[in-house]
């Protein structure tokens, strides 16, 4: 059986070493092509007419004036009269014109009448009164969930849990399918319990989404020696991809579509476009070269992607490009749900956690918002949790890097930090004290990571009790947080070819969204063949290549590296079989090292790589590698799941202005076998920088009167800039106990803890908790003033 296992450290030539990214030359030279750069002959410019209201019904649409304008080649009504709009900026009409000016003029010429409906865009206040229990779903509710882009898995869960008010007819199912309902949703509807008595019952915007009780909560609190109560929260924020969402579509003939799209899932887009376009998925060719980030928001072709294809069809097959302007990107391309909670948590005097009680709420837009996984990381023995999902009109929710985990970290780690302060304990000692409450898989990891992080931060010298490190108007403090994630590799297929001239090609239907996926694949292949990484010719970003999963859930590194490893080992072994007679050796006695194929026991008996490949014959060696999403007992598992990390932050707070400056952040992280330390460290640093943004600046600010976003631009929707980025130090956990686990994903974990760590550092600095992120000057000053008035 081929030796698919990852090589031991002494037999690795590239794996675990710092490698120049293989896409670096095209990026720094400006040659990298993104969706916006696709400019084929006859390119038409797509434009979306968006609804200005947060909640309304479309009464009428008149596109006649736009259709008559010179230069307008196609108009497509996306939502017909009678349709309900659930957020400002939702798409109503799309058009294509010969230039952007004409497209803008045509959009202004379209007349749409709306019936305004009541809207809600707030979510930070606790739900008024008792939340209603979720009732059975009507077919309109299901249709609304499709319009609101509620994830399929969540739709199925709600249908199964709550049932429906009426059994769907064949026509109902057909219409839902045309609206985008997948087979799991349709199957769930047909199997669901029917509750006709619930039909017509008015639905509350505040739905009791979860009530969980474990252990003897009241008894545990009554017997606890120390109890802390607090209010914590993180608002709705958006993805802010450097490259906005967009698609260029072109019909190559009447039945074949070519789509260039900015997506995190190139192999899955055709299947999503097939039903709306009434076209076999095999007739849709999806391609991309480079993607400027997605962070969970770019898995769907979206309404504008479907529109670009339909406009192209109406325009005689000419390419139509629709790219979201920055304002629309911030308004409608997805948001991270909010999460707020009143938390009461208790411990013994020695710091042993005994009880947790929380009333949480939040929104992900019209689809409501699920309960974040609280208490996070720690399985506190006695728990009571109630969550209220708020359905409002703030915009559509989408997965945001580590869905729900950053919010859970804020709610949990800040509550625990407050409890540690009440116990007069160093929070690191408090966390270490309770490591027996985390999963056994992670206990050793955290125990090893904490002292490393503390040494990097200088925690012992910098931590002081709350509010005691003051120098004039400057307060300094440190804070910490821990996090966990899965990250097992997704299903992935890889085709690898070795040619008689020595060239090596890999084809894989994955995508590189800026994370270094190309480099990861090249390093794994080159390591096994004894070649430099740039010797591998990589072809990715196309659904005509072997399928590979979407880049989400930190599943890509494990998936692509495992399928590549299997393919390259098979191809290398086939090459050894061809070469062995020339070296008077057995194939199993050969190795590929340093551009040579040689005898393991006698390196002088060798052929250069090109000489060895010349023995192949006329036809290339081809091999196929596959990684299973679920571990198989029949072959070695090259990927795994479950990581843990510790982050610490040091801040300086100006108590006159309320401005928070992060002075230093450290991150200690495991991810199994590290393919390239530079890529891994970059991912951790990127997560920490992203965390600084949502900790200090980011919030989707809404006008409660109009229901519109007030900061849909990069001037007022602020991200961390160069002057905001502090000293960043990263340590990757590698070696014995880590490498043998195989490759585990790293995209999500580093972004989970920064918000909580920075919030805890600010509380340590000024001696009082700022309840909600972002930690803006007004909130900091308000908290500081309350402390001063209390005589602290």
What do these predicted ranges mean?
Residues 1-133, 197-668, 725-727, 731, ...:
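Structural alpha/beta core scaffold segments of enzyme domains
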Residues 132-198:
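General marker for long, soluble alpha-helical cores
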Residues 653, 693-699, 746-771:
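C-terminal substrate/ligand-recognition segments
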């Amino acid at each position: 059986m081929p030796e698919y296992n990852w090589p031991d450290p002494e037999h690795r030539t590239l794996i675990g070493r710092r490698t120049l990214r293989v896409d670096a030359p095209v990026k720094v030279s400006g040659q990298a092509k993104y969706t916006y750069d696709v400019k084929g002959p006859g390119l038409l410019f797509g434009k979306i007419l968006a609804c200005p209201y947060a909640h309304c019904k479309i009464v009428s649409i008149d596109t006649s004036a736009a259709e008559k304008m010179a230069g307008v080649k196609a108009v497509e009504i996306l939502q017909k009269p009678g349709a309900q709009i659930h957020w400002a900026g939702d798409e109503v009409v799309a058009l294509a014109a010969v230039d952007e000016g004409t497209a803008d003029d045509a959009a202004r010429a379209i007349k749409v009448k709306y019936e305004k409906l009541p809207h809600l865009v707030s979510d930070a206040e606790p739900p008024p009164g008792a939340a209603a229990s979720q009732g059975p779903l009507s077919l309109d509710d299901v249709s609304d969930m499709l319009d609101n882009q509620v994830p399929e898995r969540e739709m199925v869960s709600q249908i199964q849990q709550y049932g429906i008010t009426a059994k769907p007819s064949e026509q109902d199912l057909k219409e839902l399918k045309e609206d985008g309902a997948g087979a799991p949703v349709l199957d769930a509807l047909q199997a669901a319990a029917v509750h006709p008595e619930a039909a017509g019952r008015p639905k509350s915007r505040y739905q009791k989404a979860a009530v969980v009780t474990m252990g003897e909560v009241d008894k545990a609190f009554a017997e606890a020696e120390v109890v802390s109560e607090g209010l914590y929260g993180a608002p709705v924020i958006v993805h802010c991809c450097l490259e906005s969402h967009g698609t260029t579509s072109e019909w190559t003939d009447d039945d074949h579509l070519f789509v260039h799209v900015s997506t995190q899932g190139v192999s899955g887009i055709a299947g999503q476009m097939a039903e709306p376009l009434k076209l076999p998925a095999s007739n849709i060719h999806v391609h991309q070269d480079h993607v400027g980030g997605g962070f969970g928001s770019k898995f769907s072709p979206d309404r504008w992607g479907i529109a670009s294809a339909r406009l192209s069809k109406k325009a005689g097959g000419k390419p139509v490009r629709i790219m979201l302007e920055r304002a629309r990107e911030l308004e409608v391309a997805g948001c991270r749900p909010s999460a707020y909670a009143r938390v009461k948590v208790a411990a013994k005097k020695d710091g042993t956690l005994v009880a947790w009680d929380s009333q949480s709420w939040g929104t992900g837009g019209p689809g409501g918002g699920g309960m974040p996984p609280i208490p996070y990381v720690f399985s506190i023995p006695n728990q009571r949790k109630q969550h209220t999902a708020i359905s409002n009109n703030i915009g559509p929710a989408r997965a945001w890097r580590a869905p729900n985990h950053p919010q859970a970290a804020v709610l949990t780690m800040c509550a625990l930090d407050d409890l540690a302060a009440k116990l007069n304990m160093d929070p690191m000692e408090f966390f270490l004290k309770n490591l027996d409450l985390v999963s056994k898989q992670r206990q050793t990891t955290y125990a090893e990571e904490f002292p490393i992080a503390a040494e990097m931060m200088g925690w012992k010298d910098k931590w002081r009790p709350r509010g005691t490190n003051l120098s004039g108007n400057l307060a300094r403090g440190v804070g910490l947080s821990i996090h966990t994630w899965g990250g097992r590799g997704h299903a992935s297929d890889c085709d690898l070819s070795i040619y008689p001239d020595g060239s090596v090609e890999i084809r894989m239907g994955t995508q590189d969204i800026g994370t270094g996926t190309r480099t990861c694949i090249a390093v794994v292949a080159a390591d096994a063949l004894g070649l430099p990484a740039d010797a591998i010719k990589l072809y990715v970003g196309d659904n005509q290549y072997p399928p590979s999963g979407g880049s989400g859930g930190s599943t890509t590194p494990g998936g692509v590296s495992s399928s590549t490893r299997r393919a390259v080992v098979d191809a290398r072994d086939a090459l050894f079989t061809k070469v062995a007679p020339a070296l008077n050796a057995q194939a199993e006695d050969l190795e590929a090292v340093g551009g040579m194929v040689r005898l393991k026991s006698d390196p002088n008996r060798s052929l250069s790589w090109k000489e060895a490949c010349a023995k192949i014959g006329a036809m290339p060696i081809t091999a196929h590698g596959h990684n299973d999403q679920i571990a198989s007992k029949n072959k070695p598992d090259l990927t795994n799941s479950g990581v843990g990390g510790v982050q610490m932050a040091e801040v300086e707070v100006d108590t006159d202005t309320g401005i928070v400056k992060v002075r230093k952040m450290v991150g200690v992280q495991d991810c199994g076998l590290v393919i390239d330390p530079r890529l891994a460290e970059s991912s951790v640093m990127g997560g920490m920088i992203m965390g600084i943004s949502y900790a200090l600046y980011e919030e989707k600010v809404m006008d409660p009167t109009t229901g519109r976003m007030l900061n849909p631009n990069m001037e007022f929707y602020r991200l961390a800039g160069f002057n905001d980025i502090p000293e960043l130090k990263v340590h990757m956990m590698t070696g014995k106990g880590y490498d043998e686990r195989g490759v585990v994903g790293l995209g999500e974990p580093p972004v989970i803890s920064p918000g909580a760590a920075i919030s805890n550092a600010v509380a340590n600095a000024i001696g009082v908790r700022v309840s909600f992120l972002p930690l803006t000057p007004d909130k900091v000053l308000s908290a500081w003033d309350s402390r001063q008035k209390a005589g602290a």
